[in-house]
């Protein structure tokens, strides 16, 4: 902080372990009390994803923004953060590629899930930069708990259904 006296404010507010863990990984994460884990790129997209989940009768378990230009490792780290939350029943990954390349997001999903028995279904919506390549990567690495949806609304509906 520019003003050192602000340091005391941070020390007074207890931060959940999951938020500390995410911060160490360079992720913007806030724990919420729902069952649908949310991963997106950009605060606006994540907030609108929370809204669409709510419109479809669900409650978000978190706000997790991987930011712009996220690499495969970032996505893998985001999924690791959600694995620690026992309230998560499904995960919705909603990416609109601009700076963030959807093929790298897909690689991160495969990296994080390969050889693992997933504890929850992952619903993925990719759009934008290299989205077709990203979808091909996901299709080339099928997993019975990974679902691809074309729209944010259909992805949110499925995430809510799978999270019940």
Name each model feature, range by range:
Residues 101-112:
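Short Gly/Thr/Asp-enriched flexible loops that form oxyanion-binding sites at enzyme active sites
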Residues 96-100:
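Glycine-rich, proline-tolerant flexible connector loops at the mouths of alpha/beta enzymes
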Residues 1-93, 105, 115, 127-129, ...:
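ATP-dependent carboxylate/acyl-activation modules
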